[in-house]
């Protein structure tokens, strides 16, 4: 989920509440808080706790919330994980060690420490195309409350390999929006990504329709969706910001530095035309 921000970079709680209520109204399956899209790494620990508290207070268990707690130090991740559980998070997620070159042993120690500090389900967040070894999977399977993974990779065989090696015991989420249907073929149970803030209902519909056998429609949608992603990727934040304003009346604000992308002034006509093309795959909008 986006973390809406004010001009000074602080969290905009008013817009965040509007976004959360929108997601609940749309009957999406959950909220992933303070991940890459939510700019979690760009907030200090105290601000991350404040955002988590506010979001969990708003949701009031009306929708599952997974809080991302990845940080530079394992100790901070542990504090954030405990805080999230104390305030009602349904699950916790974390990337592996960052900045310092991490060995598999470092990653395992990091994940074990976070998981041991909480009782709610834990979902490591694997980013990149580095494969997860059989040994790593065996060790992760020994962590009692590790219930799955978020996998942001373009390598579908890696996702399938993890599904096979884990014996189907884990709930896997794909993180590459442009491959959400492809990943479903490899055993993912759902998808977590930035574009679902704007296109959540249609993406949920298409993914389920694909699983139900509507492959021609899903292929047509995915090509349309992938074309859009390729077009907007260089200036994706400005597209999201204006798109959310036009479609839902929600201002997510500018991206926090250094995440800012080039400030491209997308025309409202172009934005709405592209949004309509993607949303045309929703039955209620295309009778």
Label for each model-derived stretch:
Residues 1-2, 22, 26-28, 37, ...:
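C-terminal alpha-helical cap/extension of soluble enzyme domains
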Residues 6-9, 15, 47, 103, ...:
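Solvent-exposed, flexible loop/coil residues
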Residues 59, 118, 166, 247-248, ...:
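A broad structural signal for alpha-helix termini and local helix breaks/kinks
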Residues 16, 48, 52, 77, ...:
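A general structural signal for well-ordered alpha-helical segments in protein cores
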Residues 51-52, 83, 87, 112, ...:
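Short alpha-helix boundary/capping motifs
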Residues 122, 145-146, 256:
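Glycine-rich phosphate-binding "P-loop"
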Residues 3-131:
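Active-site beta->alpha loop and helix N-cap motifs at the rims of alpha/beta catalytic domains
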Residues 113-117, 128-233:
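Catalytic alpha/beta core domains of metabolic enzymes, predominantly
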């Amino acid at each position: 989920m986006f973390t809406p921000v004010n001009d000074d970079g602080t969290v905009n709680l008013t817009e965040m509440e509007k976004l959360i209520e929108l997601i609940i109204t749309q009957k999406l399956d959950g909220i992933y808080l303070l991940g890459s899209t939510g700019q979690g790494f760009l907030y200090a620990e105290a601000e991350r706790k404040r955002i988590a508290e506010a979001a969990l207070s708003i949701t009031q268990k009306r929708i599952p919330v997974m809080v991302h707690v990845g940080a530079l130090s394992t100790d901070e991740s542990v504090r954030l994980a405990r805080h999230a559980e104390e305030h009602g998070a349904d699950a916790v997620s974390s990337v592996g060690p960052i900045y310092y070159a991490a060995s598999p042993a470092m990653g395992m120690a990091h994940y074990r420490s976070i998981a041991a500090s909480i009782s709610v389900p834990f979902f490591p967040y694997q980013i990149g195309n580095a494969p997860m070894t059989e040994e790593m999977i065996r060790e992760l399977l020994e962590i009692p409350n590790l219930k799955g993974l978020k996998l942001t990779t373009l390598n579908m065989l890696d996702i399938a390999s993890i599904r096979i090696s884990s014996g189907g015991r884990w709930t896997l989420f794909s993180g590459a929006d442009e491959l959400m249907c492809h990943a479903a073929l490899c055993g993912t149970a759902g998808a977590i990504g930035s574009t679902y803030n704007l296109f959540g209902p249609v993406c949920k519909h298409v993914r389920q329709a694909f699983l139900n056998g509507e492959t021609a429609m899903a292929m047509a949608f995915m090509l349309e969706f992938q074309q859009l992603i390729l077009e907007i990727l260089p200036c994706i934040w400005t597209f999201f910001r204006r798109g959310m304003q036009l479609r839902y009346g929600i201002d997510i604000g500018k991206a926090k530095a250094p995440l800012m992308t080039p400030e491209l002034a997308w025309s409202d006509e172009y934005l709405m035309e592209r949004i309509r093309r993607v949303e045309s795959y929703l039955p209620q909008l295309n009778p």
